[in-house]
Amino acid sequence: MKLPIYLDYSATCPVDPRAAEKMMQCLTLDGNFGNPASRSHRFGWQAEEAVDEARNHVADLIGADPREIVFTSGATESNNLAIKGAAHFYVKQGKHIITCKTEHKAVLDTCRHLESEGYEVTYLDPQSDGLLTLPQIEAAMRPDTILVSIMHVNNEIGVIQDLAAIGELCRARKILFHVDAAQSAGKVEIDVDAMKIDLLSLSAHKVYGPKGIGALYVRRKPRVRLEAQMHGGGHERGMRSGTLPTHQIVGMGEAFRIAKAEMAEENVRIKALRDRLYDGLKDIEQVFVNGSTEHRVAGNLNISFAYVEGESLMMALKDLAVSSGSACTSASLEPSYVLRALGLNDELAHSSIRFSIGRFTTAEEIDYAIGLIRDSIGKLRDLSPLWDMYKEGIDLSKVEWVSH
């Protein structure tokens, strides 16, 4: 077993060797290196063929038509293109957007930008388990609502929203439905037709593909129109100009093909490892799982260890690659905004650790992690005066602290 152990698959995944192998064949002179937009020679035709094959694999995973797949640089760009693109195109129909407070920053900050352009955004509060209810979303809808943007699986707490019900509601009200599926593709079944999704953002590196490539699903029937955010040669049906990176697209296609073939079997194995990890930790005193345990992606376990600082625990767990909050925001020392939105106090939010398990995690690694975590929690609590006070039965919420 090699140290450190990687338990941060929600931040990124290593590229599957099968996808990496395919990518290597699209880089050098003796490989498929051409520009897919070069129509006048074989190098271009072969590259275009490879891109088309990958596009089919991406479409297959979500039940889409390949013509509905637009390649982008990743889910952040896809979210920007979907939300800004739809908001700008349909501005005459209204300027109201609905989203959730626990969305990824790529959605929240895009919405904030639109607010500066005069759009109105309703940010819904999730329930304490991280899920939204249908009446909540329906109550927020107005005659001028043009878009609802809700993520499928949350990147921090792994909860799965009921997209089919939300899609049904949006379609009945003739409101566009955008889904950030960066964390769910390859882990949870997605059917864009059955779920009545109009726009769906995808990322390759969360599905064991390369970084720097993603896609946006844009429905053709009923047709969804977007205003391009990137202008140039008119690639990707005018929605996203720029030379297509054949090697990255091929890597993404192969990763999505593997995901479709192996997802069901892989989920059983990963969920067993996740349960093994939780079973090894659940009898520690004052340990809380954040987010719904029932509606949850297989590889995610987000736990708060009361009376232990998340940052100090991460330092103690230097042999484990885990995160406190998401990688995109964990550089700040603020408590997770996702956990705050669930109603957790600052102390519990600060004491949270996200473990995310993936394709290459082993039972041996999980057992090692359990031992290390239990040992570290014990040592850190021994150093904590707050833990001593808690053990003495003092209600810390009633203590009046004196500032110096």
UniProtKB/Swiss-Prot annotation:
One of its GO terms (cellular component) is L-cysteine desulfurase complex. [2Fe-2S] cluster binds at C328. This is Cysteine desulfurase IscS. It comes from Tolumonas auensis (strain DSM 9187 / NBRC 110442 / TA 4). Master enzyme that delivers sulfur to a number of partners involved in Fe-S cluster assembly, tRNA modification or cofactor biosynthesis. Catalyzes the removal of elemental sulfur atoms from cysteine to produce alanine. Functions as a sulfur delivery protein for Fe-S cluster synthesis onto IscU, an Fe-S scaffold assembly protein, as well as other S acceptor proteins. PANTHER family: CYSTEINE DESULFURASE, CYSTEINE DESULFURYLASE FAMILY MEMBER. One of its GO terms (biological process) is [2Fe-2S] cluster assembly. It is found in: Cytoplasm. Its cofactor is pyridoxal 5'-phosphate.
